[in-house]
A protein has these predicted regions:
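A detector for small-residue-rich transmembrane helices and their helix-helix packing motifs
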Residues: 1-186
Length: 186
């Protein structure tokens, strides 16, 4: 439907799947686990980075995670885990970049990442490429983003614009998915 599926991305030009795959889930347990993780990490990330930066981190982690998965795995893949790992990477980055304010969290988030890596290799049905890509993208985006500046500054307006661009791209991706699906079922 909108999963990451390399043949459709490569031959069909369906690049929107790199976005939509991050919002689809394979069952109740899958969505509950990712929702719990997002509620926990999302609140911490929003507090640290602000809503605009967090949204950009989430989006970049999703897209880069599924892009790395597209390059490395032929399997069908869905789920918000690439973005969840991106938020873990973001919290590691901020704990390194601002140790006085967030350094006390570093061990916790490195522990989460290590637990995730160990679990990933024990469960062969999990998309390791997407998770690793999300972790790297979240770390890199957060390291570049830093924490919020003065309200109304050029930097803050740029992050707000970027977050709106991510929302528009996500909406356009779902529109493309809908149009593809409605056309392919006729």
């Amino acid at each position: 439907f909108g999963a990451k599926y390399p043949p459709d991305i490569r031959e069909g030009g369906q690049w929107w799947r790199l976005v939509t795959a991050g919002f689809l889930h394979g069952g109740l347990i899958h969505i509950l686990m990712n929702s719990w993780s997002f509620l926990t990490l999302g609140a911490l990330a929003e507090e640290a980075f602000g809503a605009s930066r967090m949204l950009v981190i989430y989006f970049c982690s999703t897209v880069f995670g599924f892009y790395l998965s597209y390059l490395g795995s032929p399997a069908l893949s869905i789920g918000a885990s690439a973005a969840i790992f991106g938020l873990i990477g973001a919290m590691i980055a901020i704990s390194i970049k601002e140790p006085l304010r967030y350094g006390h969290m570093k061990r916790t988030f490195i522990g989460w990442a290590m637990f995730g890596v160990v679990y990933l290799f024990l469960n062969l049905r999990i998309d390791n490429y997407a998770h690793f890509g999300g972790l790297v993208a979240g770390f890199a985006t957060a390291y570049l983003a830093g924490t919020p500046r003065a309200e109304g500054s050029f930097t803050e307006r740029l992050w707000q614009f970027s977050s709106w661009a991510c929302i528009v791209i996500t909406a356009a991706s779902f529109l493309k998915m809908y149009l593809w699906f409605s056309h392919s079922t006729q």
